[in-house]
Amino acid sequence: MPPTQAESVIRSIIREIGQECAAHGEIVSETLIAFMVKAVVLDPSNGFNMDRTLMKSDVQNLVKLCMTRLLDTKNPSLDTIKMQVYFDMNYTNRVEFLEEHHRVLESRLGSVTREITDNRACAKEELESLYRKIISYVLLRSGLGSPTDIKTVREVTAALQSIFPQAELGTFLTLSKKDKERQLKELTMIVTGIRLFNRDCGKGGEGIDDLPAVLHVAIPATMQHIDYQLETARSQVYRYTAILEKAANDPHMRAELQPYMLKEALYNIRQYEVFLQIILSDIITGAQEVEMMTKQLGAHLEQLKMTIKSKTAVPTSQVFPIFIALSTLWTSLQDETIVVGVLSNLFTHIQPFLGAHELYFPERAMQRHLNGATVKTDVCRMKEHMEDRVNVADFRKLEWLFPETTANFDKLLIQYRGFCAYTFAATDGLLLPGNPAIGILKYKEKYYTFNSKDAAYSFAENPEHYIDIVREKAKKNTELIQLLELHQQFETLIPYSQMRDADKHYIKPITKCESSTQTDTHILPPTIVRSYEWNEWELRRKAIKLANLHQKVTHSVQTDLSHLRRENCSQVYPPKDTSTQSMREDSTGVPRPQIYLAGLRGGKSEITDEVKVNLTRAVDET
């Protein structure tokens, strides 16, 4: 089937399932339906062949299976999938969220910015209207007050006129569009800095909230609430795990308990724990940023007070950079306020996905099943096997990593989110945290941890067997794909948040590094005393000399000539580059002498008659 035709079929299936769910009174998002369709197709028990074209009967069966799972509202597995889909669609890391937030603000200010930069005002009324638009722009961009508040507008107008009077609009209109936008941003930051300084001095700040005080109250309260929920979730995890471990050795308890349902509840609460840890980590990062920015804000305000004091005029080069820094810090505080609000809202909206716990596992039943069981925390489980370590000599073909031999040991991406792969495969889905101190197995560029030494040895005997078991289990319980981070094995179900963090899957362990050592020539400082004297008479001589110095007086002498001497200075012309040019060389072509002699050999006559012929050409002929 061509890709376009397959997409059309999938869209029609999703639309049909959505309509059927709505007819049964259940409103389901298309994202959740699409995820459920892929989950049903992946489950081998449903009998769908991925390499074969779906027939009409297959489509009807697929719709029926999806409807059954989506309408089973009291199923922990469905709640986990809903939680995962909601979190993936609504969570963004801090950096990307703030970038998107700033982009949205810029787009909202686009129309106001264009009205200012494209303005061609000439008349007085038009210039006044343009100036009012600039005031509105400054207010909207800074987010400190409403443009409809008269007091706020007056305060902004006064601050703007002190740095950008209306008379300078003519110069502003001659600038290019980019320069206008840049100047508008600078004016906004300077005006914001002036208002913040006036607010700190008690002379203004109309409509400006005390963001540091608000954040110092909101962040600890949010962290405390999330911490409480996180501890409650972990307590529930430990109790579920203890009951499942007890049921593994008690057939009667297994028949009564329905372990598969309890395991789905365990996956649900474990996923909730993971999401709470992500949210809490972001809030802790925000708290650290707020603390640092609050200190910087106070330092800048104090610097401004020391610079201005009671002066009537201060150079702009001294105060404008501080005003801009104040504005930047305040904008960052505004960003932190929004981030905390979004994270708190996300935390509130994932809590309803835990509703099935009280329904299927009430407190009374839990206490009855826990009778005689030992509830262990994750930390306790790790401490039990802290001293048990894998012996590398037992494995010649496998590589094991340990904290003392791996530089980035804590940064390695552990498979299955750090849970023990052997325990999960051997117990049909029980989640126990792995202990990295036992040793991390590196197998095909992936890293695995185990909760005990025996589990590590068992997994190392046949890793592929246990990896296949985990993969098949994830096909039946699709929520495990995101919980155990199996996205690379099921690329069709990779969530958007995992696609953005794809680079983190390629962190390699650092087990070797270049190093060098050098021995100091003298480790200890020298102890030789140069002024030491062993001769008694030399010591006596120095003592007499020092005693005589007490009776001496320092004198100065000046002659008749020396008092006239003074420091002298001379001045010369600085060197400069010069050049000379000689007469140019020339040449002339003189004729070559050509003189011939005849009759030197003599002849019949007794007298030799010598003839000299000069054939040299004249100078003017050359």
UniProtKB/Swiss-Prot annotation:
| Alphabetized InterPro entries for the sequence | FAP206
Q: Does the keyword Membrane apply?
A: no
Question: Record's Gene Ontology CC terms?
Answer: axoneme; ciliary basal body; motile cilium; radial spoke
Transmembrane intervals: none
> What are the record keywords, sorted?
Cell projection, Cilium, Cilium biogenesis/degradation, Cytoplasm, Cytoskeleton
Q: Where is this region: Disordered?
A: 571-592
Q: Which GO terms describe its biological process?
A: axoneme assembly; cilium movement; regulation of cilium beat frequency; regulation of flagellated sperm motility; sperm axoneme assembly
Q: List the subcellular locations.
A: Cytoplasm, Cytoskeleton, Cilium axoneme; Cytoplasm, Cytoskeleton, Cilium basal body
Q: Briefly, what is this protein's role?
A: Essential for sperm motility and is involved in the regulation of the beating frequency of motile cilia on the epithelial cells of the respiratory tract. Required for the establishment of radial spokes in sperm flagella.
The UniProt similarity line reads: Belongs to the CFAP206 family.
Q: Specify the protein name.
A: Cilia- and flagella-associated protein 206
Name of encoding gene: CFAP206
